[in-house]
């Protein structure tokens, strides 16, 4: 199985449905005997440019280990979900379990 980093942007009007979406995608991965190494809800953030006249989106980041069947099923789910504005799936050489830079910055600003 290969390691992947999955980032997807959810329409801000659908923010309350994000936990259900993440649960569904986790279910797809575990159904195919995959593993989730990191899952981060980065919250609602400003977009660099508007997508379909939307200026903010809810960001979700996941690092997973899964086979091609699970990945294709997730891609298909993203494709047919209107709430997903954009998604990006990249191949990683190894499992990434450390906290992302965005989460570290967010925690630093909360402490300060």
Curated annotation (Swiss-Prot):
The keyword RNA-binding applies. InterPro entries: Ribosomal_bS6, Ribosomal_bS6_CS, Ribosomal_bS6_sf, Ribosomal_S6_plastid/chlpt, Transl_elong_EF1B/ribsomal_bS6. GO terms for cellular component: cytosolic small ribosomal subunit. GO terms for molecular function: small ribosomal subunit rRNA binding; structural constituent of ribosome. Pfam families: Ribosomal_S6. GO terms for biological process: translation. Keywords: Ribonucleoprotein, Ribosomal protein, RNA-binding, rRNA-binding. The keyword Ribonucleoprotein applies. Belongs to the bacterial ribosomal protein bS6 family. Binds together with bS18 to 16S ribosomal RNA. This is Small ribosomal subunit protein bS6.
């Amino acid at each position: 199985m290969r390691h992947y980093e999955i980032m997807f942007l959810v329409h801000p009007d659908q923010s309350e449905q994000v936990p259900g979406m993440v649960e569904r995608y986790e279910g797809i991965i575990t159904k195919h005997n995959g593993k989730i190494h990191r899952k981060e809800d980065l919250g609602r953030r400003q977009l660099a440019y508007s997508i379909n006249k939307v200026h903010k989106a809810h960001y979700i980041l996941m690092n997973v280990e899964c086979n091609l069947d699970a990945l294709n099923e997730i891609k298909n789910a993203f494709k047919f979900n209107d709430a997903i504005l954009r998604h990006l799936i990249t191949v990683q050489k190894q499992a990434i379990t450390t906290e992302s830079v965005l989460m570290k910055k967010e925690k630093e600003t909360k402490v300060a």
